[in-house]
């Protein structure tokens, strides 16, 4: 099979105008190898072809082959091989002069959405993807990519928690271990996604190596979030008000917390709406684009969501 694939690749190299057809034949032979269950051999052939294409300056062919290969391995639940090819997609973008386009951003978001939430490669992938999409002009990455990634995280509380644990452990300050999950929980609640808010909090506090078993927790902010999730289930405004008053010292650590809580008060406790600014913070950098920051949109959303949610 390897000889047949290499022969097809050599034919593609000679094809000139027929180059795309040759690449498609290579893809077809690789697909057949994967379909037969020859995962290791196919993976190695993908890598061999990638470095050959890159050395020849065929960045587009290298990227497209790795992207289709990653999707193929994902469809066969070969997470390690798929994640490796996904990283090679990024490498092809980083080493070429490829311009940021919607299609490329959507491809990267697709790969991210298929990665195992527990995979350490997921954090590395999203960090490199955001860095590439910034084009060197900013640190946060392209807004379109933020939006696409946010949709995946919004749907997957456990995956979000695992990524936050990995990110906090490898790149965050130990003193801010509680702030990572607080941002995520508060913003999930601002999106009316109570289920994901609970999942991300439980998963994060159980898996983070720097958090002692609770509740109650050593960190006051974690206790506040725990009580807040219970209060949301109860829907009693007096409980919510007292809770926010008692934990003001912890809530002052980030000026955005009270803005989140204003919104949460509107959504779950019937507090009258007030004008708010856009959402921010670690996860908010992703969710901000999803929620929108236009004045007209904010006004309409505020009117639509101002009534309290019916709680059992």
UniProtKB/Swiss-Prot annotation:
Single Gene Ontology BP annotation: tail-anchored membrane protein insertion into ER membrane
Superkingdom field: Eukaryota
Major site of localization recorded for this protein: cytoplasm
Pfam families, per database record: GET4
GO cellular component: BAT3 complex; cytosol
Gene3D superfamilies, sorted: Tetratricopeptide repeat domain
Biased composition regions of type Acidic residues, renumbered to the chain: 294-304
Family: Belongs to the GET4 family.
Subunit structure comment from the entry: Component of the BAG6/BAT3 complex.
Protein name, as recorded: Golgi to ER traffic protein 4 homolog
Source organism: Gallus gallus (Chicken)
